[in-house]
A protein has these predicted regions:
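Conserved AMP-binding/adenylate-forming
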Residues: 272, 305-306, 313-331, 335-437, ...
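Conserved AMP-binding/adenylation subdomain of ANL enzymes
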Residues: 213-230, 238-278, 292-293
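Structural core segment of the AMP-binding/adenylate-forming
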Residues: 62-63, 90-169, 494-496
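Conserved AMP-binding/adenylate-forming core of the ANL superfamily
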Residues: 15, 25, 33-78, 82-86, ...
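AMP-binding/adenylate-forming catalytic core of the ANL superfamily
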Residues: 102, 109, 119-121, 279, ...
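Conserved structural elements of the adenylate-forming
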Residues: 50-58, 172-177, 191, 205-227, ...
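Conserved pre-ATP/AMP-binding loop-to-beta segment of ANL
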Residues: 32, 143-144, 158-165, 172-194, ...
Length: 543
């Protein structure tokens, strides 16, 4: 032991576990009268937000919820969802945010697997939740959320109440001065998120308080959030806990603008009326903004930061967003990394680049997020790092405090994911000389044709360069001669038409002949609720 190891012990005065709940507590103390939440006509200050979250935690505790229990929520982007992100972990319990697009079988699996003791359900989803509860083995307390701002002309009808009490009644039971519980350890679980489950049942990904707290700071840095940002909820809060933004805004005393449905008019109204500074979403949200009807569009004065994930947006989309007043930042991550763990951090000197050189920079995923300790491209078996040559393909791997604790009740999957002391993403990419990574494909999406590897992303990029293409997805089609060949599924922009032969010829002008799709099918491309293309659905379609 050295001199710095003696008589310098950890104690309550010099160490407290990190938790994002402290972000809200501080904002309520320092900025009690600032508006924290906007939802239709409703306005809630930070003092009210904190008090209601404490009431929720208190009410749950009085009903027996304690450390290590699971509270499931199936809620839209509403104030109740924001309160659940704070009130549930205040008891020491773990928040499970259920994807609102799931079917009853998967919901029932998640309720049983997580051993959910309480379910908070928005009445928009009461029908599927009622069906799921009939299939599930657990018998949780069911609480209905009746959104007072649910529009009368909604595209879907509000379902019946299925619970034993209503959300506001539950909150009213609680104490606004509730002495909530700090985690015993910052490694304690704060939330549970399930993977998409494209093969078999989904895996339960466990987040801890430390990672969630650090993501609060990291999001502020990566998104360039100054004081009092205004954040529009176009990203579902159930998706990786909304990339941890429910916990982020309080760091800078920002305002949450809730949005139940992503509609062009509602987004432009929020941008113009509330001075929105930041939003997140898949490329489909950008397309909705760019292609909005003239009657839905409104002018706004501020420059808006738009964080997007999934595949890098085509240059035409980026140009359209810039012209409309948005600065697009490309992020990359997985459920297992709390959402974004890589950011394409733009450099001022790149603004002087010509079109092709600039496009090459925007096509990359980027560098490690501020809260991530290390990011590497490695050989998945030998664990040797690939050279930074922009050509040698390896598996993208993560290491740091915003990597999950592991998969719930699945030690084998956790051990495999963490093999060699790194989280294995399953994504294939290259490392460029300047340290930026670029994805080339998912391991399962590489097409091997005649012994040659074809990146489906490269083929999709070529298709996106055609002015009539709105969405493109390329998968492998079994072929007796070549083993596999590229098959493209394409959605055209409204009112556009192009032939299969024209698109194949377009690709041949941009790709090696063996990389070009041999067949193109024009149809709607299936996507998840967050806008990600579901290639496994397309694979099933071709057998």
């Amino acid at each position: 032991m050295g001199i710095y190891d003696e008589h310098l012990d950890r104690n309550a005065a010099n160490y407290q576990p990190l938790t994002p709940l402290s972000h809200l507590a501080r904002a309520a103390l320092v900025h009690p009268d600032r508006v924290a939440i906007i939802h239709g006509a409703l306005r809630r200050t930070y003092a009210e937000f904190y008090a209601r979250s404490r009431r929720l935690g208190s009410a749950l505790e009085r009903r027996g919820i304690a450390r290590g229990d699971t509270v499931a929520v199936m809620l839209s982007n509403t104030p109740a969802m924001l309160e659940a992100h704070h009130g549930v972990p205040m008891t020491g319990a773990v928040l499970l945010s259920i994807n609102t697009r799931l079917d009853a079988d998967i919901i029932a699996f998640q309720l049983d697997h997580s051993e959910a003791r309480v379910v908070l359900v928005d009445r928009e989803f009461s029908g599927v939740m009622a069906e799921a509860l009939k299939k599930a083995k657990v018998t949780p307390l069911v609480v209905d959320y009746d959104d007072p701002d649910f529009p009368a002309d909604a595209p879907v009808a509000k379902g019946p109440a299925i619970g034993s009490l209503e959300y506001e009644a539950l909150v009213a039971e609680g104490d606004p001065d509730y002495a909530w519980h700090m985690p015993n350890d910052e490694w304690d679980a704060i939330s549970l998120n399930y993977t998409s489950g494209t093969t078999g049942n989904p895996k339960g990904v466990v987040y801890h308080h430390r990672g969630a707290a650090l993501m609060g700071y990291a999001n502020v840095i990566a998104s360039g959030m100054g004081r009092y940002p205004v954040y529009l909820w176009t990203l579902p809060m159930f998706h990786c806990n909304g990339w941890c933004f429910p916990w982020t805004l309080a760091v800078q005393a920002g305002t949450h603008v809730c949005l139940r449905w992503v509609r062009a008019k509602a987004m432009f109204d929020a941008l113009a009326d509330h001075g929105v500074t930041h939003l997140c979403g898949a490329p489909v949200v950008m397309a909705t903004l760019i292609n909005a009807d003239a009657g839905d569009k409104r002018d706004f004065d501020q420059t808006v930061t738009f964080n997007t994930a999934a595949a890098p947006p085509p240059q035409s989309v980026l140009s359209g967003m810039r012209d409309a007043g948005f600065e697009v930042t490309h992020l990359y991550g997985l459920t297992e990394t709390y959402g974004p763990a890589v950011v394409n951090e733009w450099k001022d000197e790149w603004n002087a680049l010509d079109g092709p050189a600039r496009a090459a920079k925007t096509a990359r995923q980027g560098v490690r997020y501020p809260a991530l300790e290390d990011l590497a491209v490695m050989h998945s078996e030998t664990m040797e790092k690939t050279p930074a040559d922009g050509e040698t393909i390896g598996e993208v791997m993560f290491r740091g405090n915003i990597v999950m604790r592991g998969y719930l009740k699945n030690p084998e999957a956790s051990a495999e994911a963490f093999r060699g002391g790194w989280f294995h993403s399953g994504d294939l990419g290259v490392l460029h000389e300047d340290g930026y990574i670029e994805l080339k494909d998912r391991a399962k999406d590489i097409i091997i044709s005649g012994g040659e590897n074809i990146s489906s992303i490269e083929v999709e990029d070529a298709l996106y360069q055609h002015p009539d293409v709105a969405t493109a997805a390329v998968v492998a089609k079994p072929d007796e001669k070549w083993g596999e060949t590229p098959l493209a599924f394409v959605e055209l922009k409204p009112g556009r038409s192009v032939t299969e032969a024209d698109l194949i010829a377009h690709c041949r002008e941009r790709l090696a002949r063996f990389k070009c799709p041999k067949e193109i099918r024009f149809q709607e491309v299936p996507k998840t609720s967050t806008g990600k293309i579901q290639k496994y659905v397309l694979r099933k379609a071709i057998g």
